[in-house]
Amino acid sequence: MGFIYARKLLLCMAVSIYAIGSTTTTETTTSSSSTSGSGQSTSSGTTNSSSSPTTSPPTTSSSPPTSTHTSSPSSTSTQSSSTAATSSSAPSTASSTTSIPTSTSTETTTTTPTASTTTPTTTTAAPTTAATTTAVTTAASTSAETTTATATATSTPTTTTPTSTTTTTATTTVPTTASTTTDTTTAATTTAATTTAATTTAATTTAATTTAATTTAATTTAATTSSATTAATTTAATTTAATTTAATTTAATTTAATTTGSPTSGSTSTTGASTSTPSASTATSATPTSTSTSAAATTSTPTPTSAATSAESTTEAPTSTPTTDTTTPSEATTATTSPESTTVSASTTSATTTAFTTESHTSPDSSTGSTSTAEPSSTFTLTPSTATPSTDQFTGSSASTESDSTDSSTVPTTGTESITESSSTTEASTNLGSSTYESTEALETPDGNTTSGNTTPSPSPRTPSFADTQQTPDNGVSTQHTTINDHTTANAQKHAGHHRGRAGGRRGSPQGGSHTTPHPDRLTPSPDDTYDDDTNHPNGRNNSIEIVPQLPPDRPIIELGVATLRKNFMEASCTVETNSGLAIFWKIGNASVDAFNRGTTHTRLMRNGVPVYALVSTLRVPWLNVIPLTKITCAACPTNLVAGDGVDLNSCTTKSTTIPCPGQQRTHIFFSAKGDRAVCITSELVSQPTITWSVGSDRLRNDGFSQTWYGIQPGVCGILRSEVRIHRTTWRFGSTSKDYLCEVSASDSKTSDYKVLPNAHSTSNFALVAATTLTVTILCLLCCLYCMLTRPRASVY
């Protein structure tokens, strides 16, 4: 019984505990919900407070709408944000987009202080708000003024059409801030643009907010500057914005980043633009993305606005109320320079970031029109780089031209000028490279004689210039040429008209680059050419007659050698001692083998303790392409006598030799497998030789052997094959073996070989002994095996 009572008692206790527990839970739930409600109200409060600072005194009235805004669906807030990002719209965005609340709130916080500061500075900004409202709509729609309604619908989807209206009011309150906040809101609102915006939100919050602050300071400056200056500044800003627009089209994120850069440049030079036309600054960052105030206007021609003439159009916009006119200037811009804009936009799109970076550096000249132009110029630099034929040269010219183009507000014109200069630069470099030879003229002595005969070491410019000309590209040549006296180019241009190309190895005009030789490895003209051209040219410099002289008594020394150590290739080396610019050519027989030229190197040799400048050309030809004993020629020709595909070797210094056989003459004797023949083979013969056979002490007559002659072939000299029949006799055991001697005598050499043929009888005896030994061994093994198998085994038991 006691056990039963205990069970009941425990059961009662359990039930009571359970009841108490459930009661507690209910209470907890209730408190939780109440807490949630309080949190909700707190959020609303925050929104209201944030909108108030942004609004500034006149905006205070719009704070209530802001509250409504907050209470309304978050999506609506997002739309509003597009219009005036600074407004509580940012917070609303946070509430609307639960995923990005933090980022939105951050942006709002930063933007709000900036907005408050900026608003007072820019009076015009207020009107901009109206434009901004349109922009907001655009931001939502992401590209059209008409989208206003659409934008509202989009933002309202969450549920707050009224909220959208309220937002408009708030926006009006924060025109200036709008530029900054707009980007943020856009991030929250737009979907397609949201990606852009989203990225922009993070970037905008930090970068964009900072921009707002900068804009404030910039705005002050703009206000101080005269309207004209502001217009100029605005022009720069607009250009930037325009560029941004293009970039924005490409990537919304870029737009956000651009906005940051834009404010920076704006702070210095475009600051006025930022404030005067928040639409401009905003348009820059927000127009594409969230369509800042200028979004509406920009929407009309967002890309065009980024257009090249943004400078011109914008100038008017800021001058007349940046607010209302903001839209108008946009249109004007569109009408004025849609084509140009388009052109610039394309190139700018990829280079937007670079352009803004440049603007940041240019910012020191904020109030001047030059600064504003600097931005476009930086942007433009990227544009022409795409179209310019020669990127390298254009870059050089653009660097020097940017300052000039900066003065002119027309971007297209600047591009034209830059290109023109580029082309002129190209010509200059061409002259430099092609007139290298002409520099020799300046090196001549007053009496008309050249300095080639000098035994003294070449002057410092000589060797490097020659080396550079040979081994570096054109740009290297032009660089090297700058070390030569400036009059070289003048002389080159002066005498360029006198020279005319001629067939048969005569030089063409240096201006046209006719120095090109048949083979790329050939040397190009050197400033130290020894010989002049055209014998038919009556008038030369210094009023002296120009005649192609025969090579002077001190002709360059040429050494030619052929190596035969390699089996597969014939290698030849030609060394020319000279201080002049020479081109080296090769011939085997009557055929040119320049295609096998391994190149020419420049070196210094010591002759009698004096350093001598020399050229070394190497030729490497497969033996299969070479017939031994053929004549090989190395020709060193003055570069000014080389033209077209032919070379007049009569005016060149040549060195010839005979290609030797690939190897040394050698003789070998071989015995046939059967031992019935002895063969003597001699190779690398220049001509058919005389052969003599000796067997033992007997010398065979000419009819005692046969011989075959194989003439010279590619890669192989003559071969002689001789054969002797071996007549066996019955040799007895112990008889001496026979020895064979083959002697081959050529015109310039004699070779021989000696071999001994073993005694055939002794060989048979050896075989017999070997066979006997093997047989006995096998028998022994068999016996052992038999014994092992037949041996009796012990019984197991």
UniProtKB/Swiss-Prot annotation:
Effect of T430A: In strain: RacL11
Residues linked to a glycan: N590
Protein name, per record: Glycoprotein gp2
Chain intervals with Basic residues compositional bias: 495-505
Organism lineage string: Viruses, Duplodnaviria, Heunggongvirae, Peploviricota, Herviviricetes
Membrane topology: Single-pass membrane protein
Gene Ontology biological-process annotations: viral process
Transmembrane stretches, start-end: 766-790
Keyword vocabulary terms for this entry: Glycoprotein, Membrane, Signal, Transmembrane, Transmembrane helix, Virion, Virulence
Subcellular location: Virion membrane
Chain residue ranges for the region called Disordered: 24-188, 212-549
Compositionally skewed regions (Polar residues) per UniProt: 374-394, 466-492
GO cellular component: membrane; virion membrane
Chief subcellular location: virion
Function according to Swiss-Prot or TrEMBL: Virulence factor.
Amino acid composition bias (Low complexity), ranges on this chain: 212-373, 395-430, 445-457
UniProt signal peptide: 1-25
InterPro entries in the record: Varicellovirus_Gp2_glycop
